[in-house]
C-alpha cells in the first residue's frame, strides 16, 4: 500500500496517556465531561485533549511535518464525579508552546475555542486551570494591585465601600453627578457606573465624566478623604475605549471601569496596560459571566474567568456575595476570592480548587461583593471577605428612606462598627445583629436603614 496510514482513528490511542508526568511548564486543565451514551470516558477525555490542541478528525499527511509528541495535549487522568452518573473529571496537560505569550485571548481560543460543540460529548465544563509560572510571567496582570491601591487611596485596615448609581438608565449627567456627590459625601469610598452605562442618548460619556469628576472633587474637599467613581470606559471599539480612559486621566480621577467579558480580553488587556502606564486603577465588571458559568455541567466555572482576569489585568472584580440576591456557595466563592488575592493557593477540592496555583508575585485583585446586600449583611460580609474587598451597596444605599447621603452614612457606620467589633475580638458571625443594633442607637441614619431592611 502506498502513502501513509489514512483514515479516522481512535483519539485515545494518541491522546490518552495515563503514565504522563506533568511538567512545571504545562498548562493543566480540569474538565467536567459528560460523554454521550456508549462513549467510554477515556475516549471522551482524549477527544477533549485532541480537539483543544493538535488533533483533527482524521489523519492528515502534514502531521508528518511536525512532532506530535512535542505539541499534543494529553489527557493524563480521569476520575468519576461522585454522586453523578456518567460524569467524569478529565485532566488535560497542554505544552506551553501551544500558546502565545501574554494573550488570554489565545489561551482561551486554544483551550475552550472549539471543543465545546463536540459530538461525542453531551456536555463539557472547564472547572479549573493551572497556569504555569513561566506563562504567568508573560502577563502584566493587574495595573496596580491591592497594596498600591491602598497607598493611593490612603485607606487601610478595612474593606472599601461602594455603591452603584441607580436608576441605571435614564438619569441626566447632572442628576447623575448629584447622586454621586451625595453618596461620596455621606461616607462611601467609591460610586460606580452601572455596567450598562456607556454612552447613550440620555447621557453621553463626556458629560457624565465631567459631572462625576466635579462631584468627586467636591466630596473629597468636604470629607478630607480620597474618593473615586468608576467611570465606565467600555465602548464599541478599543480606540473609543482608550479615548475615554485618556479623558478620565486628564480629569485626574483615580479609577475607570471595564466590562471585561462583553468588551473582550483583548480590549481588557489593552486598557489594563494603559491604566498601569497612567496611574489609573481599573474596576472590572463581569457582565455576561452567568451565560458562561451558570450551568453546572457545561461552560466554564467562574474561577477560570477570575484567573483569566488576573492575568489580563484589573484591580477590582465582582465575585458574588455569598449572602445577597445572586447565587454563590460560600466555600466555592471563598476559593476563587483567594485565587484573586493571594500569591499562592493550595489545591483544595472541597473549595473547588483543582490545582495548586502559584502567581509568582503577580499583583492581587480586590474581590467586589455586590447585589442585593444591605446593612444587616455587613457583619457577615466583613467576616467572610475580610479587609481586602470592596462591598457594594446599590439599592442598599440609594433605597434609604431619607435619601442617598444618609444611606451612605448608614453603611459607613455599620462597616466601622463591624471592623471595630472584630478588632476588639468579638465574633461577627454570632454577634453580628447585636453589633448593628448597638451602632444604630447612636446613628439615626443606620436605625432608619435597619428598619427598612429587616433581617
UniProtKB/Swiss-Prot annotation:
Post-translational modification: The disulfide bond which can form in the large chain dimeric partners within the hexadecamer appears to be associated with oxidative stress and protein turnover.
Role, per record: RuBisCO catalyzes two reactions: the carboxylation of D-ribulose 1,5-bisphosphate, the primary event in carbon dioxide fixation, as well as the oxidative fragmentation of the pentose substrate in the photorespiration process. Both reactions occur simultaneously and in competition at the same active site.
Places the protein is found: Plastid, Chloroplast
Residues marked Transition state stabilizer (site): 325
Record-level GO BP terms: photorespiration; reductive pentose-phosphate cycle
Protein name: Ribulose bisphosphate carboxylase large chain
EC number per UniProt: 4.1.1.39
Stated family: Belongs to the RuBisCO large chain family. Type I subfamily.
Binding site for Mg(2+): 192, 194-195
Additional remark text: The basic functional RuBisCO is composed of a large chain homodimer in a 'head-to-tail' conformation. In form I RuBisCO this homodimer is arranged in a barrel-like tetramer with the small subunits forming a tetrameric 'cap' on each end of the 'barrel'.
Modified sites of kind N6,N6,N6-trimethyllysine: 5
Species per Swiss-Prot/TrEMBL record: Lupinus nanus
NCBIfam families (alphabetical): PRK04208.1
GO cellular component: a single term: chloroplast
Cofactor: Mg(2+)
Catalytic residue positions: 166 (proton acceptor), 285 (proton acceptor)
Alphabetized PANTHER family for the sequence: RIBULOSE BISPHOSPHATE CARBOXYLASE (PTHR42704), RIBULOSE BISPHOSPHATE CARBOXYLASE LARGE CHAIN (PTHR42704:SF16)
Record text on subunit structure and interactions: Heterohexadecamer of 8 large chains and 8 small chains; disulfide-linked. The disulfide link is formed within the large subunit homodimers.
Positions that bind substrate: 114, 164, 168, 286, 318, 370
PROSITE patterns: RUBISCO_LARGE
Keywords: Calvin cycle, Carbon dioxide fixation, Chloroplast, Disulfide bond, Lyase, Magnesium, Metal-binding, Methylation, Monooxygenase, Oxidoreductase, Photorespiration, Photosynthesis, Plastid
Catalytic reaction list: 2 (2R)-3-phosphoglycerate + 2 H(+) = D-ribulose 1,5-bisphosphate + CO2 + H2O; D-ribulose 1,5-bisphosphate + O2 = 2-phosphoglycolate + (2R)-3-phosphoglycerate + 2 H(+)
